[in-house]
């Protein structure tokens, strides 16, 4: 029978060092709150029940952690009296009698399912407490994990460690799994006889051993246990997340010419044989199909780029942009809430918003769909194999039929039937010999302004 597990996320800190108007766990990593990354890792570890311990910005933190994947229940920690005190804020949930209780932090967005599963496996093997640790590049300041004959005998804080213990690089990552049948008894035994008068979760190791229980440590990569307390650490975590995701995508068949310049969101979906040129930014909600090319300096958000399509350089796809197979959106173009049909071309200096562009159509440089009247948005519909000449304004709501041709420089305010040619511009008026007369007048006006300025 599968073991039951309650995960407790500690997210009640004041976030003082973050120097922010909102809780640190609400700050985004790869486009979503860092606490949402933690919840996602728990879901990936097949954990279905989460107790979220909240304090500052409780409602916003609870909303950010909400998901369809796991059941999240929030518990308010009214006082800040240490990590064990925070865990006991979820006493009601712990008392339900889960097999495993897993304690994690809301500010560790790089954690993955693997060490969480390893910790639970440690409980399944008969251990009472399992601490998740890491081999520190620089262990200074971290609590050391003292392991003897495979058992974790103590967590020694740096300030209390002997010289020999300080040479240990196996450090406490803070995350912990506890035998759910014993969790409340063990937690209730933690005292606060220390300089700060706080209740520390790390005391569980020695308490369990004093009751003839057993504690062990399992190892996770150091980066997965990176916590976030400052803006500098937030930037570092973002960099680590981006590096990890880029590497995964390249191994899956995505080509990146300069991967360090590509920035992804948490849900960016890139298929095999997608090519990304340098300096591409993906906001949330982007899906790119096989064979598509995203040229340099493009920004995509909420967009679907279908197989073989090309984007950019210097293009912007906003939410609702849907590019058909082998279509093209070129340099200095913006597409928003619009469908570009298969093989259609929007090559240069164009805005397509709230529109449908049919398959095979060609939209000339400088074309604008005038979709907003100051109050409401309106739709432009362009049929298949139509041609819109350069520098045209399509004033929505308006339709251009299949195979129609719109002359350059037109302002189109009425529907254009299929296969029709539409001219929507003033007739050109040429006045022979008039240029020298106008030039002479302009020079005289310029000279008069100079004389007036000199006389001031």
UniProtKB/Swiss-Prot annotation:
Domain of life, source organism: Bacteria
Residue ranges, annotated region (Pyrophosphorylase): 1-231
Region (N-acetyltransferase): 253-456
Position of the signal peptide: none
Keywords: Acyltransferase, Cell shape, Cell wall biogenesis/degradation, Cytoplasm, Magnesium, Metal-binding, Multifunctional enzyme, Nucleotidyltransferase, Peptidoglycan synthesis, Repeat, Transferase
Gene field: glmU
Active site, UniProt feature: 348 (proton acceptor)
Binding residues for acetyl-CoA: 365, 371-372, 390, 408, 425
Name under which the protein is recorded: Bifunctional protein GlmU
Compartment list: Cytoplasm
MF annotations from Gene Ontology: glucosamine-1-phosphate N-acetyltransferase activity; magnesium ion binding; UDP-N-acetylglucosamine diphosphorylase activity
């Amino acid at each position: 029978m599968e073991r039951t597990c309650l995960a407790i996320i500690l997210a009640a800190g004041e976030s003082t060092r973050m120097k922010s108007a909102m809780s640190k766990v609400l700050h985004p990593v790869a486009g979503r709150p860092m606490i949402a990354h933690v919840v996602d890792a728990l879901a990936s570890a097949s954990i279905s029940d989460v107790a979220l311990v909240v304090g500052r910005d409780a409602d916003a933190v609870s909303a950010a952690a909400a998901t369809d994947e796991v059941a999240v229940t929030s518990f308010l920690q009214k006082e800040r009296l240490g990590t064990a005190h925070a865990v006991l804020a979820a006493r009601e949930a712990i008392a339900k009698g889960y097999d495993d209780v897993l304690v994690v932090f809301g500010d560790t967005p790089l954690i993955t399912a693997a060490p969480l599963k390893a910790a639970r496996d440690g409980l399944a093997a008969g251990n009472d407490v399992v601490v998740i640790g890491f081999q520190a590049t620089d262990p200074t300041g971290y609590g050391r994990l003292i392991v003897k004959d495979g058992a974790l005998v103590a967590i020694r804080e740096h300030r209390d460690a002997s010289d020999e213990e300080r040479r240990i690089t196996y450090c406490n990552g803070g995350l912990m799994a506890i035998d759910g049948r014993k969790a409340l008894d063990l937690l209730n035994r933690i005292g606060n006889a220390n300089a700060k008068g706080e209740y520390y979760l790390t005391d569980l190791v020695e308490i369990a051993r004093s009751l003839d229980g057993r504690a062990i440590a399992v190892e996770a990569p150091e980066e997965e246990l990176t916590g976030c307390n400052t803006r500098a650490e937030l930037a570092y975590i973002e960099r680590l997340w981006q590096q990890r995701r880029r590497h995964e995508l390249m191994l899956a068949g995505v080509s990146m010419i300069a991967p360090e310049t590509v920035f992804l969101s948490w849900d960016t979906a890139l298929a095999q044989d997608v090519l990304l040129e340098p300096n591409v930014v993906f906001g949330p909600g982007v899906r790119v199909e096989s064979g598509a090319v995203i040229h340099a300096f493009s920004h995509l958000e909420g967009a679907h780029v279908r197989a073989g399509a090309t984007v950019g350089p210097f293009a912007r796809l906003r939410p609702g942009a849907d590019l058909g197979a082998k279509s093209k959106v070129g340099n200095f173009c913006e597409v928003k809430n619009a469908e570009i049909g298969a093989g259609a071309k929007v090559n240069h200096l164009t805005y397509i918003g709230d529109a449908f562009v049919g398959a095979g159509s060609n939209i000339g440089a400088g074309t604008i769909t005038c979709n907003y009247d100051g109050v409401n948005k309106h739709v432009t519909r362009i049929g298949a194999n139509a041609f819109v000449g350069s520098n045209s304004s399509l004033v929505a709501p308006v339709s251009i039929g299949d195979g129609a041709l719109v002359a350059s420089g037109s302002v189109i305010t009425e529907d254009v039937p299929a296969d029709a040619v539409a001219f929507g511009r003033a007739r050109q008026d040429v006045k022979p010999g008039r240029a020298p007369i106008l030039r002479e007048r302009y020079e005289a006006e310029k000279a008069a302004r100079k004389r007036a300025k000199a006389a001031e």
